[in-house]
Amino acid sequence: FFMRPIEQPIPYLFVDASYYKVRDGVRYVTKAALVVSGVRADGYREILGAKVTDCENEAFWAGLFEELKERGLTGVQLVVSDGHEGIKRAVSTSFLGASWQMCQVHCTRAVLRNIPKKLQKEVAEWLRRAYGDEQRLQEVADKLNAMGYRKSANTVERFLPGLINYTAFPKKHWKRIRTTNMLERVNRELKRRTKVVGVFPNDESLIRLVGSILMDINEDWISGIRYLTMECEEE
């Protein structure tokens, strides 16, 4: 499944991870099952690849992206993920001319991590209204800084360039390309169906089960409803 050719251009690429306990020798460690999916040129979703790792640095991501390109991945214009520096750097070198979009949901979570609970709802609303507008996001950062929440202000400023890239694409796509929600639902299904295992004996057992679940999801996606209406479909 993860060796098959990628036959269509993938303008929108989504990356997300879920975490599992895996036995590593005599130890039990947490490892990431990273899933890469995309929206094809015909508007349908497709699961492109998955890998188990305990290291998410730039070299890992660059290697994974290279494997996908060797299988035929082309046409990438936007990569949507969390704020992991390794992904950001790998996108800039692996997909020349493509943009990186910070998932707005992940950004909000990161900002609220350092905000008192009584203010979280209000700050989340500020962010919701500001996303997609560079000036308004900077105003939110300045406001948080003035209130003494420097860490949260730094988070907004650090991700700011990557929070507005989705606005360069058709407006009708915005809702679905500004977050990794498409993969969040996949990860929930993975968690639900792997729960019975508890701890995996090795990486291979984890990727086997994850792979079989992703195959089922991929079949549903390809045979289901078109996820986005692409420009070529309207002509």
Locate the predicted segments by residue.
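RNase H-like nuclease fold core
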Residues: F1-V80, E85, R89, S94-G97, ...
